[in-house]
């Protein structure tokens, strides 16, 4: 079985897909990663609001580690994220609040990854939708 480099966790937002592809191409990862796409990316797999989704992601990550021999998780969130707005509820929402939500989701996923998959490297990126 061929060894791949990583699993990429990214958001379902259609506006975001070309950005993810371009980012991974620049990183020379085309054809070298498995992919998991879910609303909010790290937000979707860590927020209590989306708890039912969490095990599905971690089961897929475990499968990719076994089948594809990956050694890294690349988490790519984006600005203007609808999932961030959903978990924020009806409260005031702005870029500063959204940055905190992304940061919290990265902290939470890193904690779980370090516990469940201690040998797995992890990287985080928040992409802008507009240049």
Regions found by a protein language model. Give the residues of each.
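Short secondary-structure capping micro-motifs at structural edges
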Residues: 24, 59-65
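A short beta-strand-loop structural module common to alpha/beta enzyme folds
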Residues: 31-41
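Short, ordered loop/turn segments at secondary-structure junctions
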Residues: 78-80
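Divalent-metal-activated hydrolytic enzyme cores
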Residues: 1-20, 39-53, 65-72, 82-131
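A generic structural signal for alpha->beta connector loops
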Residues: 29-32, 119-121
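Short Gly/aromatic-enriched secondary-structure transition segments
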Residues: 21-27
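Short glycine/proline-enriched loop/turn "hinge" motifs that connect secondary-structure elements
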Residues: 27-30, 67
């Amino acid at each position: 079985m061929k060894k791949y480099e990583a699993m990429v966790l990214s958001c379902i937002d259609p506006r975001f897909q070309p950005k993810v592809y371009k980012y991974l191409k620049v990183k020379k990862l085309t054809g070298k990663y498995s992919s998991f796409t879910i609303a909010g990316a790290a937000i979707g797999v860590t927020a209590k609001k989306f708890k039912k989704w969490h095990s599905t992601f971690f089961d897929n990550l475990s499968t990719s580690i076994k089948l594809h021999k990956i050694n890294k998780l690349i988490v790519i969130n984006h600005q203007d994220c609808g999932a961030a707005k959903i978990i924020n509820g009806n409260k005031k929402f702005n870029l500063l609040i959204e940055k905190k939500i992304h940061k919290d989701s990265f902290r939470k996923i890193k904690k779980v990854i370090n516990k469940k998959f201690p040998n797995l490297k992890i990287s985080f990126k928040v992409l802008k939708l507009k240049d």
